[in-house]
């Protein structure tokens, strides 16, 4: 910076020492040199901002003490990522090869967040949103040592539009994985989201963690764009059905939740058996949970296709079946209290 100031001072002195005619002729040259110095200054400023952001992210991670580990339930236990795992996850993100079928929820109650991630993977715009949010980070030795993750959320100021950069080099041992049981991009997003909340993986109410929540907020936290809810209380009108159909057939992420549906619709200890059609054409009953969130995969005049963040469903016998299923509109409006429609740009 001192060199740039000295250079500008020298340019000023040289220019002021010229006669008026030479000043007029030489002005473009001096302007070009001044612009070059300004570009260098702007570059230094951006580098300083980047270094400050990285420093803050690393400090935030270092100061984050995961709740729920010392008390013995272990829900917040974290597992470090090896360089090989980081490279594999980064390769998946860079390729854009992401699908809602990549996601299997395990011991953390963040179905609302995972359903929103699943919904983003459906469109190129949604996948780009994920790619833009996760950037691999390299250590001094040139090897990948984690990810810088942008989270559009500030739990201390929930009504304000804010974002933070979080450094992630570990994931929840009881958190989301791919079908192969290995961590993936969803694991990175989940880890960053938990790091943003004082309660980590604990309950979202009394502990201010990420277990329990609503798809609307999660969708906004992932996209930095507004989301709207279509209420199913009293059923979905023809216009509301059309709105959901149009959204499900667009690039926008769409999710649905059962938590706000009438409790009497889930008479079996918070569960209900519902007739559905699986992707292979098999008709069966699957168990729906009364406090769960799902991705809306598709919708048309005949019904709605959904995907369970668990990665599978259970039929009435307990048999595991495909995580994706199609149900009638009549059943959808009975069991799903609201539908969240997000936006990606």
Identify the meaning behind each predicted range.
Residues 36-37, 41, 48, 56, ...:
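Generic hydrophobic, helix-prone segments enriched in Leu/Val/Ile
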Residues 60-138:
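Flexible propeptides and autoinhibitory/regulatory segments associated with cysteine proteases
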Residues 127-129, 143-146:
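Active-site-surrounding "flap" and adjacent substrate/cofactor-binding loops of secreted or lumenal enzymes
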Residues 19, 31-33, 45-48, 142, ...:
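Generic alpha-helical secondary structure signal
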Residues 18, 22, 42, 131, ...:
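Low-complexity, intrinsically disordered short peptide segments enriched in small/polar/basic residues
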Residues 95-122, 145-299, 305-345:
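Predominantly the structural core of cysteine protease catalytic domains
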Residues 1-89:
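Intrinsically disordered, low-complexity charged segments of secreted bacterial virulence
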Residues 1, 13-17, 142, 270-272, ...:
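Acidic, glycine-anchored loop motifs typical of Ca2+
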